[in-house]
Amino acid sequence: MNKNALFALLGALVLGFGIYWFNTPQGKVKIAPVPEVVSEVVRQGSMASYIKRDTPRNLPSFSFVDASGATKDVGVLKGKVTLLNLWATWCAPCRKEMPELAKLQREMGGADFQVVELSEDLKGYDTSAAFLKQVGAENLTLYSDDRAAALDAVKGPGLPITLLLNREGQEIGRLIGPAPWASDEAKALIRAAVDAK
């Protein structure tokens, strides 16, 4: 078989496969967007990884404990715009961003906004509280989830993951990984959430 005949045969096979593919059900499959569609991603600046949700999303159900050991659920996150940070003491990026989160709470925390730390550390509340004290972040509200159920419930790929919640306790955005939370860009995100009554 000469070269021209070989190329003609290969071309006919490719063409035939293409016609077959586009005329069968698998060739007509349309790719749908992910159900949890987001409307925008901040594409520049220090918050470039922040993902804003198209519509607020209810948090899945999970529980955690407070300083007294009392079990709480996501209902305690309602009432204020909340920056919910899931972290652990063994997570180096989590440790690095903690002073930024404490600074954000000092500068913007109050009647309308709060930073809440939800430790996924398997060593429990006391270990996490000791770390916050060590880095001067004891001004942050701390809860502990020593089963790491929250991380699984919010489908976090790893730590840290930070969720921005509206006053109804619904997720309106998230950032996976560390961020400079005391930056002007982060404060602008928080102000926009607070102003969206």
Model-derived features with residue positions:
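N-terminal targeting signals for export/organelle localization
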Residues: 1-58, 197
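A short beta-strand-turn-helix
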Residues: 52-56, 61-82
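Envelope-exposed proteins and targeting segments
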Residues: 58-60, 114, 160
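Conserved redox-active cysteine motifs that mediate thiol-disulfide chemistry
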Residues: 78, 86-103
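Loop/turn elements at helix/coil->beta-strand transitions in domains of secreted/extracellular proteins
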Residues: 79-81, 111-114, 139-140
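Soluble periplasmic/extracytoplasmic beta-strand elements of cell-envelope proteins
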Residues: 85, 117-119, 174-176
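Structural microenvironment flanking redox-active thiols in thiol-disulfide oxidoreductases
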Residues: 95-135, 144-152
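Thiol/disulfide oxidoreductase modules built on the thioredoxin-like
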Residues: 130-139, 144-195
